[in-house]
């Protein structure tokens, strides 16, 4: 009951309004505010009123302008960067090592036999008929060649370039690999390009190269990708270099280690790779001292004699230092350690800590990125490299109908190959150079808020070439092959030293350049300096604004009521106060009814009764209390 009464009073108060006009509110505000200036407008003479009005308006505008600048600066979400450097006990970084050759040629030769024979014929044609050693009667598998051939482009006439196939009689369907003698074009006078066709050869494009070496390498890699994409992953792993053959010796600090301390992982570009101190199943190993004696020492055998001849142009190891539980994108971020060299890597860990939203578009774990992370099956942390490659594979599947061999596959999808997807090479080439695809993926992917990097390695040193040092290779040969003879070639050995430098960490951390405290301090400083105001002055101004809005709403409601219908007439008001349901009491029948005179009813008033409450000089509750006192 009390709540209903309270709410009813509140409703009546809202309907009544402040009880002032606009002018009265302004005069009240100027007379009572603590802000300097407004009070002088109503207390001075006409000239001073005008002067103080102009000054107050000027300084108010100046304060608003300064406030706008500070708010704009704050909303730019600028950051300041702090740099700290030193040495402390840290987890030793994960080290991924791979052989530059992804497979052992002795195990993949049966898969690449036709491709290698065709490659030799191509090289013979490019080198020229006089240098070609290709047997003219050798039969080749020209299905590979017809699908994606290499061509000469003669641009002696730029307006009418001539496209010439490397094998002239291949146009007639002949299986002969003999180059046409006396062809008017060679690699010295013409450009070598790759012809990519789709829709049964009706739509073709040419991918040009500045060097015949690049053209042949790209062509061979594309054909090898088609072959390996059709081989099960278990067979590919068996064709790579096993850990016990690759890793000859291992030492971490004062503790010996071996290939069992490395986690195997298959990389499409480099075959079997091995990760030391990955931290997936075991705790990461720390390092508390700088120098080579407290780092990781490795001796690797590259097995250079078993390299795939046309697939690999570098002899050595590919390695990468990265954070624990992160996927090694070794092709993009790795470095080479050349065979026959000793390479030392002094590690300086760079840690970058970015501010999140709204200061930057970084992500903490990739959950807010709209791209499916295809590398999540490795149980690794998010990285922008993983996102960009997942995005490319997504576009590849959508545009070409199949996935590329170099990237993980989503469920229920297949890798591209010439048999099932004959147009995939043309589609892949177009997608690879598409700027729209790149911009889409770069826009969708976000950088990680935490990044870790390492410093570049020191220049490599040659391994000892003199004969007194052959005992090293004798011992290594005995340990690996149980042979008293040297079975390891000095040219195929890689020695690595990975250790912390004297300063092993460098932290780059972002912090907010302008926080909310900075903003409020500057806003209050400007308001106090130019107008002598404070937060309470702003509350007073807010109060007057609320009253203005209140009065305006009441006026609008009254205007709406007057528009909907005319005001009630006097007759309607009288009718409203007339009680037509009133009937006089009839006399009760009785023996002495005639003895009494019939009581006359008073006439019904034709005007509404007066509002007697308005005639009282005191409130109703005061009168009632006085009457109660008299009664007592």
Swiss-Prot record:
Keywords of this entry: Cell membrane, Cytoplasmic vesicle, Disulfide bond, Glycoprotein, Ion channel, Ion transport, Membrane, Phosphoprotein, Sodium, Sodium channel, Sodium transport, Transmembrane, Transmembrane helix, Transport, Ubl conjugation
Modes of activity regulation: Originally identified and characterized by its inhibition by the diuretic drug amiloride.
Cellular compartments annotated: Apical cell membrane; Cytoplasmic vesicle membrane
Domain of life of the source: Eukaryota
Glycosylation sites: 141
Membrane topology recorded in Swiss-Prot or TrEMBL: Multi-pass membrane protein
Gene3D superfamilies registered for this protein in UniProt: Acid-sensing ion channels like domains, YojJ-like
Record field: compositional bias (Pro residues): 602-611
Disulfide bonds: 98-273, 185-190, 197-204, 250-257, 362-449, 387-445, 391-441, 400-427, 402-416
Extracellular side: 72-533
A biological process term (GO) from this entry: multicellular organismal-level water homeostasis
Post-translational modification: Ubiquitinated. Can be ubiquitinated at multiple sites and undergo monoubiquitination and polyubiquitination. Ubiquitination by NEDD4 or NEDD4L inhibits the ENaC channel through endocytosis, intracellular retention and degradation of its individual subunits. However, some studies could not confirm the ubiquitination of this subunit of the ENaC.
Annotated protein name in UniProt: Epithelial sodium channel subunit beta
């Amino acid at each position: 009951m009390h709540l209903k009464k309270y709410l009813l009073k509140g409703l009546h108060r809202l309907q009544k309004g402040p009880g002032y006009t606009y002018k009265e509110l302004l005069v009240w505000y100027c007379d009572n505010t603590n802000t300097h200036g407004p009070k002088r407008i109503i207390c001075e003479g006409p000239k001073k009123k005008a002067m103080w009005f102009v000054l107050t308006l000027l300084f108010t505008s100046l304060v608003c302008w300064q406030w706008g600048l500070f708010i704009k600066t704050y909303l730019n979400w600028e950051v300041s960067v702090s740099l700290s450097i030193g040495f402390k006990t840290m987890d030793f970084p994960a080290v991924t090592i791979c052989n530059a050759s992804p497979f052992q040629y002795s195990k993949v030769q049966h898969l690449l036999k036709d491709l290698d024979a065709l490659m030799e014929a191509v090289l013979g044609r490019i080198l020229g008929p006089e240098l070609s050693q290709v047997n003219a009667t050798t039969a080749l598998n020209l299905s590979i060649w017809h699908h994606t051939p290499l061509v000469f482009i003669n641009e002696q006439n730029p307006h009418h370039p001539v496209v010439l196939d490397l094998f002239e009689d291949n146009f007639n369907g002949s299986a002969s690999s003999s180059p046409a003698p006396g062809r008017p074009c060679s690699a010295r006078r013409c450009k070598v390009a790759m012809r990519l066709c789709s829709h049964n050869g009706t739509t073709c494009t040419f991918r040009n190269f500045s060097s015949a070496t690049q053209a042949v390498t790209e062509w061979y890699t594309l054909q090898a990708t088609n072959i390996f994409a059709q081989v099960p992953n278990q067979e590919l792993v068996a064709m790579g270099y096993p850990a016990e053959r690759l890793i000859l010796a291992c030492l971490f600090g004062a503790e010996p280690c071996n290939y069992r301390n490395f986690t195997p992982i298959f990389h499409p570009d480099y075959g079997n790779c091995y990760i030391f101190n990955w931290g997936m199943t075991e705790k990461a190993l720390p390092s508390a001292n700088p120098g080579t004696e407290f780092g990781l020492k490795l001796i690797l055998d590259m097995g250079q004699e078993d390299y795939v001849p046309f697939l690999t142009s570098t002899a050595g190891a590919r390695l990468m230092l990265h954070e624990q539980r992160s996927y090694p994108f070794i092709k993009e971020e790795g470095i080479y350690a050349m065979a026959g060299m000793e390479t030392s890597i002094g590690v300086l860990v760079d840690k970058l800590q970015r501010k999140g939203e709204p200061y930057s578009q970084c992500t903490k774990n990739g959950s807010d990125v709209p791209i499916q992370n295809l590398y999540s099956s490795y149980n690794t942390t998010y990285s922008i490299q993983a996102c960009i490659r997942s995005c490319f594979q997504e576009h590849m599947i959508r545009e070409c109908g199949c996935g590329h061999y170099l990237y993980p596959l989503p469920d229920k999808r297949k890798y591209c190959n010439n048999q099932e997807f004959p147009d995939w090479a043309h589609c892949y080439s177009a997608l690879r150079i598409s700027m729209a695809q790149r911009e889409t993926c770069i826009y969708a992917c976000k950088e990680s808020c935490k990044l870790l990097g390492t410093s570049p390695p020191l220049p490599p040193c040659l391994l000892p070439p003199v004969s007194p040092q052959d005992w090293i290779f004798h011992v290594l040969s005995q340990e690996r092959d149980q042979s008293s003879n040297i079975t390891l070639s000095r040219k195929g050995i890689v020695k690595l030293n990975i250790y912390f430098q004297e300063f092993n960490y460098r932290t780059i951390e972002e912090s907010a350049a302008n926080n909310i405290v900075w903003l409020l301090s500057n806003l209050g400083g400007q308001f106090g300096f130019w107008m002598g105001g404070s937060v309470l002055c702003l509350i007073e101004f807010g109060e007057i604004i609320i009253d203005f809005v209140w009065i305006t709403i009441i006026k609008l409601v009254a205007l709406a009521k007057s528009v909907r219908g005319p005001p009630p007439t006097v007759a309607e008001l009288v009718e409203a106060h007339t009680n037509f349901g009133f009937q006089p009491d009839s006399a009760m029948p009785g023996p002495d009814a005639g003895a009494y005179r019939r009581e006359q009813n008073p006439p019904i008033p034709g005007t509404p009764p007066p509002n007697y409450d308005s005639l009282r000089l005191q409130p109703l509750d005061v009168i009632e209390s006085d009457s109660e006192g008299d009664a007592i």
